[in-house]
């Protein structure tokens, strides 16, 4: 019989071949599909294997960044030991991620603001708690473009706008629907759940970032996941423009 071996140059150690007893050293970027899954019953070492791969990537490849979404707060010790950025996300956390952070490479569109408008529409649906109509969509799209106007004119440098600025733009519109949207999102811009309406105060440029979502409550979980995934998209598009690799766990 034949034994299938995997031994890539510049790869990392994953396991040992059960037949040949040789090491399995793989570089996922050399594969047709670089995605991977870790399967196993509880206690079989899935998290340990993920941590070993994270350590290997960080130590062996200076041109790669690692981003974690941690629902159980099990990666904190590893991230802190490797001088990464552990971001606790909750309604009462001191860590804030601006939902309207935007870089010039965002999305696949030549106009990043247009791509961001789609995210803001999805976010507003979550904030309002129901599907939004055609009039509301037009108002949100217009106000998003207006909110980003000066930031875009400055080539996306400086401080990005926030949801609080977006709400002020809504209040400046003449349509009563705009006032209704502004009232609906007030809880998330100026109320007790305004954690995503403030400027980002964490290092989202670190090579190793962990988004700790354990303390996200029921009200914030859908919104929090949208913002976290959008923040990750921001980083991926930045890295793609730089020719860097991004690994998501």
Which residues does each predicted region cover?
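P-loop NTPase motor domains
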Residues: 1-24, 73-85, 91-93, 98-249
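Glycine-rich phosphate-binding loop of nucleotide-binding enzymes
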Residues: 9-90
